[in-house]
Amino acid sequence: MSDLGHLMPGMAEIMPLVGGRIWKCYYAGLAKNKALASFQLKEAINLMEKGAILRPKYSEDMDEFIGGIVGKIRGCIDSEDWVGFEAAFVTMIEEANAYHEKYDKGFLRWKMPDQPPPDLDLTAT
């Protein structure tokens, strides 16, 4: 049983998936595609919650992050406040990188890719 923890995905596996969803959420929001932005954020939150369950040492901070700035982004999407959405994204990235620092992973500095994801039509509604 003690070896099962090593078989479960850790944050090093989960967070790149979160980053991909956040990337898609951001560019969907820039395209004012509420449905796609909302879906991508929901999927990112699901992955973050899974990470918090699988790695309980992160659960309190993950809950705070999801309930705080991520919740603000969700509100911006729901109300189609795209200006607030962009501003909240800047804050979210800063906060995410601050958590990396907190957990001695300051070398992990996430940034939004300069280009939208090529695998989705962000304008489709």
Residue ranges and their predicted role:
Residues M1-T125:
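C-terminal-biased regions
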